[in-house]
């Protein structure tokens, strides 16, 4: 419930959908930041664990053109989101944009290509969910979902993003990397401990 209080929604005019995983009986609705209590914010609760389950629930509930994923320690760069959305608006054949994320203190979070490139099964293995923007209708039409056997919260805690992108490519969907920063994410994050003892 403390993590819900730390959520920082984007400042722009975005529709917000919050899915909270709560396999216990924790109270969290009273912890929502004021920005998430508005009429454009929709909340849902899953009584299960596993990030792939929550991401699939978000896809299922989403009624917007595009969807960007986040967790409690992500801060979005509104100008970057707008630029990526403008690209998607101009390129209706693209189902997924993979963009960049920065650290709050150390520049880009990892090495990225310096220019736009089409996603393949060979160049997508290091994707992070908070770098992805999906075209909801295409993802739903192609039946692409996160493999719930992978991702934080289950035994195979890595690989869910890569499988999602590979499944999209296999289904004939197009993904593109854009050198645009859309989010900041700390080096030590809420997901850093998954898979460690």
Residue ranges with predicted function:
Residues 63-64, 128-145:
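Conserved nucleotide-sugar donor-binding
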Residues 67:
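Short aromatic/hydrophobic "clamp" motif used to bind/position activated sugar donors
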Residues 79-112:
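Conserved donor NDP-sugar-binding/catalytic core segment of glycosyltransferases
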Residues 151-164:
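Acidic donor-binding loop at a coil-to-helix junction in glycosyltransferase catalytic cores
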């Amino acid at each position: 419930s403390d993590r819900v209080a730390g959520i920082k929604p984007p400042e722009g005019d975005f529709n917000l959908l919050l899915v909270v995983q709560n396999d216990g009986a924790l109270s969290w609705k009273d912890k929502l930041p004021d920005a998430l209590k508005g009429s454009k914010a929709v909340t849902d609760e899953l009584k299960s664990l596993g990030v792939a389950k929550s991401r699939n629930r978000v896809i299922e509930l989403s009624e917007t053109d595009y969807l960007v994923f986040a967790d409690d320690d992500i801060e979005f760069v509104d100008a970057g989101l707008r630029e990526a959305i403008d690209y998607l608006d101009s390129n209706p054949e693209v189902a997924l944009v993979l963009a960049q994320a920065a650290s709050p203190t150390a520049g880009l979070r990892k090495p990225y290509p310096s220019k736009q490139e089409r996603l393949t099964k060979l160049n997508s293995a290091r994707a992070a969910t908070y770098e992805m923007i999906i075209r909801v209708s295409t993802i739903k039409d192609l039946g692409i979902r996160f493999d719930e056997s992978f991702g934080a919260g289950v035994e195979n805690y890595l690989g869910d993003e890569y499988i999602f992108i590979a499944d999209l490519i296999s289904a004939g969907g197009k993904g593109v990397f854009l050198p645009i920063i859309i989010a900041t994410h700390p080096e030590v994050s809420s997901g850093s401990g998954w898979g460690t003892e």
